[in-house]
Amino acid sequence: MSTKQVTCRYFMHGVCREGSQCLFSHDLANSKPSTICKYYQKGYCAYGARCRYDHTKPPAAAGGAVGPAPNPSPSSGLHSPHPSPDIATSVMRTHSNEPGKREKKTLVLRDRNLTGLAEDKTPPSKVNNPGGCSDPQTSPEMKPHSYLDAIRTGLDDLEASSSYSNEPQLCPYAAAGECRFGDACVYLHGDMCEICRLQVLHPFDPEQRKAHEKMCMSTFEHEMEKAFAFQASQDKVCSICMEVILEKASASERRFGILSNCSHTYCLSCIRQWRCAKQFENPIIKSCPECRVISEFVIPSVYWVEDQNKKNELIEAFKQGMGKKACKYFEQGKGTCPFGSKCLYRHAYPDGRLAEPEKPRKQLSSEGTVRFFNSVRLWDFIENRETRQVPSTDDVDVTELGDLFMHLSGVESSEP
């Protein structure tokens, strides 16, 4: 079957971009789907002359009581969406005489602007001559309303009834920096804020002025704190790599690793590498490389913090941020976290319940030392027994030989 016998579905909708080079047929004579605008047939096409569908009225059925209607052009005025009483009567009789079908009720729109049946807008000619057709040019009140017009309905009343509509509005261009209209601007130019140097203060609204000044002052203080922190951080040198941290080549390495119990300066990458070393014991890698003070965790920061109060705030913010992330060792109750109650991450079950912190378990060794551990496994005892040091046979032989000499000497001296 040739594709030329198949009607192009894009051409049927008026959007075929292939044109004459299309492999399908552009003949609408054999096409069953119609390109007539269904909204225009109902009388309220919002696109008007810009609609890509045909604005034509199809002829009525042969058995209908009304003759064929003329085909208006898209540029002509829209007809009234309400059928005449004769048409409505014939349609109702046709549906009521069909056996086996339920009677359909006509949908009634409650919004007058959608239906166009406002009683106060009905011209006298329509009341006097209910069967006649009114000219849309002579009666603009009877023109059908679009959906956009229905949305806009009541906005004027809403603006008029608002409490602040009578007050002049601030010019958005002057508030942003400069208004090219100057004194001829229809909007109100506000007073200049002494902090942000913008015309954003309403001269007649003290609440707006107070709120903006409070917000502006808070932003100004925050920016000043950042400026002071940057000034205090720009010459800090890492004690491990001996480089200025904020002058490193990579932007990801320009971060400080602040120890919780120490005030020495390190970059984040160096102190993390130090604490990940495997050849040292745990107390050594947790301590500061310079002063040997043990710190439980490292806080990443863009700026250097030396004040203890600011440092405490940074530690609390760091703990709160870590507490929102799920612990990868706990695994929602499926695993065991080796850090126990000291873990900064979130220990929660699948249903959202938080796990109670485990109490550290103690073990007393034969030497009298106490060690803490989180879990006890049978394999740990088996491995400890297998790796336990066994005395060598050479030591046993030497011990037995010494006992023999002592025995011989003791026997000779003890005889009577």
From Swiss-Prot:
In the UniProt record, does the keyword Phosphoprotein occur?
yes
EC number(s) per UniProt? 2.3.2.27
Where composition is biased (Basic and acidic residues), the residues are 95-123
GO cellular component terms, alphabetically, are: cytoplasm; nucleus
Q: Could you tell me which InterPro entries the record lists for this protein?
A: MKRN-like, Znf_CCCH, Znf_CCCH_sf, Znf_RING, Znf_RING/FYVE/PHD, Znf_RING_CS
Give the residue ranges for region: Disordered.
61-144
Q: In which pathway does it act?
A: Protein modification; protein ubiquitination
Q: Quaternary arrangement and interactors, per the entry?
A: Interacts with PDLIM2 (via LIM zinc-binding domain). Interacts with RELA.
- Known role: E3 ubiquitin ligase catalyzing the covalent attachment of ubiquitin moieties onto substrate proteins. Promotes the polyubiquitination and proteasome-dependent degradation of RELA/p65, thereby suppressing RELA-mediated NF-kappa-B transactivation and negatively regulating inflammatory responses. Plays a role in the regulation of spermiation and in male fertility.
Q: What is this protein called?
A: E3 ubiquitin-protein ligase makorin-2
